[in-house]
Amino acid sequence: MDEKGSPRKKSRSISYGKWGYLFIAPFFLAYLVFSLIPLISTFYNSFFERYMVGLDLIGPTFVGLENYYSLFTQGDFSKYLSNTFIIWILGFVPQLLVSLLLAAWFTDLRLRLRASGFFKTVIYMPNLIMAAAFSMLFYTIFADAGPVNSVLMSMGMESPYRFLANIGSTRGLIALMNFLMWYGNTTILLMAAIMGIDPSLFEAAQIDGASSPQIFRQVTLPLIKPILIYVMITSLIGGIQMFDVPQILTNGNGNPNRTSMTLVMYLNKHLFSENFGMGGAVSVILFLISAVLSLIVFYSFTGKMQRGGNKA
Amino acid sequence: MNSRAKNAAQRSLSVRRVFCYIFLILLTFLSLFSFYILVINATRSHPDIQKGFSFLPGKSLIFNLKNLFTNQNLPVLSSLRNSLFISACTALVGTYFSAMTAFGIHAYNFRFKKFAFAFIMMVMLVPTQVSALGFVRLMSTMGLRNSFIPLILPSVAAPIVFFFMKQYMESTLPIEIIEAARIDGSNEFHTFNRIVLPIMKPAMAVQAIFMFVASWNNYFMPALLLDSSNKKTLPILIAQLRSADFMKFDMGQVYTLVAIAIVPVIIVYLLLSKFIVRGVALGSVKG
């Protein structure tokens, strides 16, 4: 499929090259208008003081890096950063462990689980659910007078457990929802990775008398490492973007006492109150964090493609 | 291996199998229990729900629906229509242009091809939220606040869909087909629309479903852009319900509204789950 091979082909494809530009033009135009210009203007805004007091607009005045300075000294930025990180870890660790286990089981040739199609269907389902509706549902289910408390009370608990008034249970509920929404997706990605491994490697290990856990640890895990990195970093970037679930569950306040307020919820607050200077500064920091992570993914990606490039 | 060892191996395998099933059933329960409560409670009336939890559905679904659709404070019908319109347009626009971009990079050689591909891969993982501030301001100055255009047109540049299409083309679209069309005198756009798109149908279908669902579920951007009540989408309505004085609400209506937002997606998913699950695996990086 590579046309660089023969010079004749190459010279012919040059005359069609302009079509390539035409075909990719809409993408780049849309990206320019809807992402790149907004991105630059967000950066630009982060250097200005500009906010509303009642109906009066303060600024815009150029303040240099002052927004960044006050972000780290006055606001609770570091608190929100650690909230985001803690909640992400709480959901991601069980997600990865369970997904690895399920992916190993579903692809195990000796185990041959029945109804695996049914289970795959079920575990992937929560991924397609509207996060806003899902968290609204959790809010009603875990409310003081909700079904979970009514079951707990009927089992002999004296007063309802106030899930959204405690730090641990609130963070736990958000993490549980993140877990439920993503473990199916991760399982299927890992399964695809495992099924991409040359079966003769497993056969060889089996003939050598390796047990299933041994095969998993010493053959499967090292070979799916690139996908594990991919899963890890896309999940981390997804975690940085965490918004809908905690926003709806805590009504945008990050209760109790802003311990479940995430970075994007904080950004959203600035955008709604039209505090564009501070909002810009938060955006730039978010951008920097994800840019570093994206670069890592990008390099692990391209490294992979060069190795598997001739497969197509 | 003698027969005794074989028997022992068989036995340990069945023990493992039982353990797997127990674990899977637990996970299934965990994944489904909230949806079960949702469906049950959507069919029960407010006083019934207040009385406590029940495992059996009630008879008030029609009653709840009627209350919900006539509720003056919740423009459910118009938000349902808005959500459907935006999601359908996003899916159409997004898949068509992503296939077009992928085709441009797959089928032609030009100077900035490598750069273009690398660039798209770079932007793939930059969250949309980081440019939200500039985006909302730009759309306001362009007079596009409260319009669906800023929710639909940005999907022309959907890097993840592009990447999926590109991978699919690599395995199903030989350049020879395009060359044959050229010899027959087909114009390049004609080739794309009449020959490439039909070949891409399975990939287009899977990605259209994903884009539809993602747009249907989107809350962050619509909430920032749409504030007039006849333009609201379903997620905004749900958020509005959450921030309203909750105790005064008819819980039957609350559950029914959440069900309206979720259940159609579940039904479509159950019908198409084979494609969807395959689609996720297809789009992933292959080893």
Q: What do the predicted segments below correspond to?
A:
Chain B
Residues M1-K6:
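N-terminal Lys/Arg-rich, disordered targeting/topogenic segments
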Residues A8, S12, R16-G287:
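A structural signal for multi-pass alpha-helical bundles of membrane permease subunits
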